[in-house]
Curated annotation (Swiss-Prot):
Keywords: Endoplasmic reticulum, Glycoprotein, GPI-anchor biosynthesis, Membrane, Transmembrane, Transmembrane helix. This is Protein PBN1. GO terms for molecular function: mannosyltransferase activity. GO terms for biological process: GPI anchor biosynthetic process. Required for proper folding and/or the stability of a subset of proteins in the endoplasmic reticulum. Component of glycosylphosphatidylinositol-mannosyltransferase 1 which transfers the first of the 4 mannoses in the GPI-anchor precursors during GPI-anchor biosynthesis. Probably acts by stabilizing the mannosyltransferase GPI14. Glycans are attached at residues 172, 277, 339. Residues 1-413 are lumenal. It is found in: Endoplasmic reticulum membrane. It comes from Debaryomyces hansenii (strain ATCC 36239 / CBS 767 / BCRC 21394 / JCM 1990 / NBRC 0083 / IGC 2968). PANTHER family: PROTEIN PBN1 (PTHR28533:SF1). The gene is PBN1. One of its GO terms (cellular component) is endoplasmic reticulum membrane.
Length: 450
């Protein structure tokens, strides 16, 4: 039996007139543009060499309580199973690639090590195969419109799979009983008059459609409960732009924000999270003084060209002072030469800027049905403790474009001539050295005659 929990947020001020029909077999809502989350708990075959796996496809953003803010695109995290005999690397990657091959085009050596986890990120990716896989897992019972760029999260914890979908609801929101599913539907709105940022009050209805319960007499229940959000929205804003500077561009960010002051907060610090594709890197020795701490995972070899690196790139988390403007120096790696253009245009995600705040009564965060924190994945969340809440500043940018200079294919001829001259020079130097030795050391026979 598959467990399905559907949460539907009513954007109006009242639930009156929202439900058009309800009984023990179905629920029909009026046609309103709802935001919706489906959570499925599935029993699937266990992996032999994978301990935990989290796939996050982030395409849809909203400030609704249903949504957590992560870096846009595809984020995949995987922990290998380590037994008494250690870690079987070959078998682990065979099992991981067997699953990934049917969903995403990820090279075996494209992952980076991040803390104790393998991590892969791609800002934009073809998601059709993954969405089709999700349709099959859920038996097409989702109430989220999968045609309108949904967020999808697949989590394998070693025992079961938890699948979360959120985004816009289907145009015709009618949920029916299914003998293979235990369904719980919540229709909620926020009681704004008695809610605050750190204490949100939800009121509404719960509908139970148990597939194996013929009577199902208590299918409709009124409900009201409090939610303490981990992911919160700051009133602050920021904007980023790239200042071209040849192979060493600057990522400039203007920040307009005040430190949060909700009642449950203890202390707050401002953070800057950035992922960079393998065309760029940050040199920790050239960080401006505004960045007071620094964590970087990925290939940190500063000399390798882009085409010699297999990993997707790197992720960076930094604490920053409350400056109004910061400028992060980036370094471009040498690109593969091309005769058609002397510039390669590539994109990076806009950084995420947020306050990380220690909070009182942190146990209330974990009791929220919408808390998305796990011990694997979640971009920046992994670097913070369980008692941290996040206040996200708003930005209108998603992708930033950067021009990288590159040579043309005549560089091969130049390299050949350069190497030839270098070899000739080395040969000449050795020739002169040997010649000098023979001049200083005449033969023994010559010395005897003298």
């Amino acid at each position: 039996m598959i467990r399905q929990r559907t949460t539907i947020f009513n954007p109006t001020k009242s639930n009156d007139g929202i439900i058009e029909a309800v009984d023990s077999s179905h629920l029909q809502l009026s046609s309103i543009d709802y935001q919706c989350e489906d959570k499925f708990i599935l029993q699937t075959p266990k992996f032999k060499y994978i301990d935990k796996l989290r796939i996050q496809l982030n395409q849809f953003h909203s400030e609704s309580i249903l949504f957590s803010k992560y870096q846009a695109g595809l984020n995949i995290y995987c922990k290998p199973k380590i037994g008494d005999e250690g870690f079987n690397q070959e078998e682990f990657f065979n099992e991981l690639n067997q699953m990934m091959t049917n969903l995403f085009d990820i090279p075996r050596d494209g992952w980076i090590n991040s803390l104790d986890t393998l991590f892969y990120h791609e800002p934009s990716t073809g998601s059709e195969s993954f969405i089709e896989y999700v349709r099959k897992l859920t038996g097409n019972e989702s109430n989220v419109n999968l045609e309108v760029s949904p967020n999808i999260e697949y989590v394998y914890d070693g025992e079961k799979v938890v699948l979360k979908l959120n985004g816009k609801s289907l145009a015709n929101t009618t949920i029916t009983k299914n003998s293979k599913f235990n369904k719980e539907i919540g229709l909620f709105l926020i009681e704004k008059g008695i809610s605050s940022e750190d204490d949100i009050v939800l009121s509404g209805l719960r509908v139970i459609l148990n597939g194996d319960d013929d009577k199902n007499e208590e299918y409709l229940q009124k409900t009201l409960f409090h939610v303490k959000r981990r992911q919160r929205q700051s009133r602050g804003t920021y904007s980023s732009q790239v200042k071209e500077n040849g192979m060493h561009p600057f990522l400039k960010t203007d920040i307009h924000s005040d430190i949060p002051n909700d009642e449950d907060l203890i202390q707050c610090k401002l953070y800057y999270y950035l992922d960079l594709n393998k065309s760029f890197f940050v040199d920790k020795y050239q960080l401006p003084k505004e960045f007071t701490s620094y964590v970087n995972f990925g290939n940190t070899d500063l000399e390798l060209p882009e085409y010699k690196i297999n990993e997707w790139g790197s992720e960076i988390l930094m604490e920053i002072e409350n400056n109004q403007q910061i400028s992060l120096p980036l370094h471009s790696r040498y690109q593969l030469p091309n005769n058609e253009s002397s510039i390669r245009v590539t994109g990076i995600n806009d950084p995420l800027i947020f306050y990380g705040c220690d909070v009182k009564d942190s146990y209330l965060l974990e009791s929220s049905p919408f808390d998305n924190r796990l011990d694997i994945g979640g971009n920046y969340e992994r670097f913070f403790t369980d008692n941290t809440v996040f206040y996200h500043l708003s930005s209108h940018e998603n992708q930033l474009q950067i021009n990288i200079p590159r040579g043309n294919e005549s560089i091969k001829k130049i390299n050949f001539v350069t190497n030839l001259i270098f070899i000739a020079g080395v040969v000449l130097i050795f020739y002169k050295i040997v010649q000098g030795i023979f001049k200083r050391n005449p033969s023994a026979g010559t010395r005897k005659n003298e």
